[in-house]
Amino acid sequence: MIKHYTTILLACALTVGVGLLTSMSFAQTDRWQALRDDPTINSGLIVIAVGRQIHNSCDDVNARLLRALGFAESLVSHAQTLGFSRAQVNAFIDDRTEQQRYRDIASQYFAERGVQPGDGAGVCQVGRDEISAGSAIGRLLR
């Protein structure tokens, strides 16, 4: 009889534990969704992701590090006005799923401009075009 009650208690504890973890996971996903849905944060992180890919791919295109740092800090400040702490913003940026999502968006950005995966020269040309146009991406590069 006691063994039966122990089994029931363990099953209840497991159910509550799984429910709590699932709720925490959904809460985290919802938190990230608020950052993803904010146009300033989303477009800013796309600018950084594309600029970073250009910088990493092109010897003749350099990052304007202080400008990029200031731009990134403006995104953190904006997220803080939305109620997020710096630690939460850092957790969002460090999240591997989010990093991959922004890499995928950057790849799509290049594909829309006719750059195929592995086409370093194409990436560099897009970078030079962005610099010439004075776009948000171009302002982070030289």
Where are each of the predicted segments found?
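Bacterial N-terminal signal peptides that target proteins for export
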Residues: 2-12
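Bacterial N-terminal signal peptides
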Residues: 11-20
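Sec/Tat signal peptide C-region and signal peptidase I cleavage site
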Residues: 20-27
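Short N-proximal segments of mature Sec-exported proteins
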Residues: 33-96
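Compact alpha-helical subdomains of small soluble proteins
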Residues: 70-142
